[in-house]
Amino acid sequence: MDDILVTSDLTSRYKISRKTLWSWQSADTMPRGFVCPFPPPDWPGNPNRWRSESIKEWEDKKKIN
């Protein structure tokens, strides 16, 4: 079974605010140097939840080489 990450796990992991996390979901507001926006939650709700595998895939392809 995949590990599940919630919003607070991700804000701690990347040392960002919740607002920054949500702004990363748009290609228009993503920082330069990233090739793709942050993935939407696998399970929206309160709290939002992501599969760790979804986050790992994003981490593997997020940076321009």
From Swiss-Prot:
The keyword Chloroplast does not apply. Residues 45-65 are annotated as: Disordered. GO terms for biological process: DNA recombination; provirus excision. GO terms for molecular function: DNA binding. Keywords: DNA recombination, DNA-binding, Viral genome excision. The keyword Repressor does not apply. It comes from the Viruses. Residues 50-65 have a biased composition (Basic and acidic residues). Excisionase and integrase are necessary for the excision of prophage from the host genome by site-specific recombination at the att site. This is Excisionase. It comes from Enterobacteria phage phi80 (Bacteriophage phi-80).
